[in-house]
Amino acid sequence: MTDHDNQRWLQLWRERRTDFHQHGVNLLLSRFWPAFAPATPSRVFVPLCGKSLDMLWLAEQGHDVIGVELSPLAIEAFFRENHLPPSKRRQGRFTLWRHGRIGILCGDYFALSEADLGPVDSVYDRAALTALPPILRSRYVAQLRRIVPDTARVFLLTLEDAEADATLQQALGVDEELAALYTAGFEIALAHVESLFEPDPQNGAPRRVEHKVYQLTGKRPASPEADGRAAETED
């Protein structure tokens, strides 16, 4: 993120303006993850994790969880509030906080390398993408493609404003911005849509929003051999 965005995020945690934090496990995660997850425990990456309780739930399912979070206050609060005494050590440009199956790298997501992150089987994104300014979202997706293997799958939860004039097909379809961001690198499956009226965070007035569950599967890059065979076929 830009230095301005980083400072704003750190300030939110210093001033405890964290209304975005959910005080329980996300119900869509507990409902749809079991069908998405590998049959055996895996390593799950949680970008921009804050102090999300979803990490506890994932660890309770037997997964190893690795998050990344810019604010040390958020990380400290996660371990303190859940009575988990962490160990801390340097890992590249990051500090790794760990207790049991849960580790959180303290630092900038955009500075994360594949070596810093380590092996990943799945990615859990609950509104990390949509929390970013639109100008940064393509960078977020490009960075994800750089640091996770092509075989990793993404469990993506989004909160989208419902368009008043949207057709039913549009409301129940893949968001246009999301399709533009992910189609080049992932196969996109929309698993669930839930339309609700919720208070507008700006003025409290009711607004209709759509909670969507996406399951993304990485596209493997074409090998040089495959490209050569395709060219021979065309000839």
UniProtKB/Swiss-Prot annotation:
Database matches in Gene3D superfamilies: Vaccinia Virus protein VP39
Stretches the record annotates as Disordered: 199-235
CDD domains, per database record: AdoMet_MTases (cd02440)
Subcellular localization(s) per the UniProt record: Cytoplasm
Disulfide bonds: none
EC class name: transferase
Enzyme Commission no: 2.1.1.67
Entry annotated with the keyword Ribosomal protein: no
Entries under InterPro entries matching the protein: SAM-dependent_MTases_sf (IPR029063), Thiopurine_S-MeTrfase (IPR025835), TPMT (IPR008854)
PROSITE patterns, A to Z: SAM_MT_TPMT
Catalysed reactions, semicolon-separated: S-adenosyl-L-methionine + a thiopurine = S-adenosyl-L-homocysteine + a thiopurine S-methylether
Gene Ontology CC annotation, any one: cytoplasm
Primary subcellular site in the record, as a coarse category: cytoplasm
Positions with biased composition (Basic and acidic residues): 226-235
Gene Ontology process terms (BP): methylation
A GO MF label: thiopurine S-methyltransferase activity
Binding residue positions for S-adenosyl-L-methionine: 13, 48, 69, 126
UniProt KW keywords: Cytoplasm, Methyltransferase, S-adenosyl-L-methionine, Transferase
PANTHER family reported for this sequence: THIOPURINE S-METHYLTRANSFERASE
Annotated family: Belongs to the class I-like SAM-binding methyltransferase superfamily. TPMT family.
Protein name: Thiopurine S-methyltransferase
Organism of origin: Stutzerimonas stutzeri (strain A1501) (Pseudomonas stutzeri)
Higher taxonomy: Bacteria, Pseudomonadati, Pseudomonadota, Gammaproteobacteria, Pseudomonadales
Gene giving rise to this polypeptide: tpm
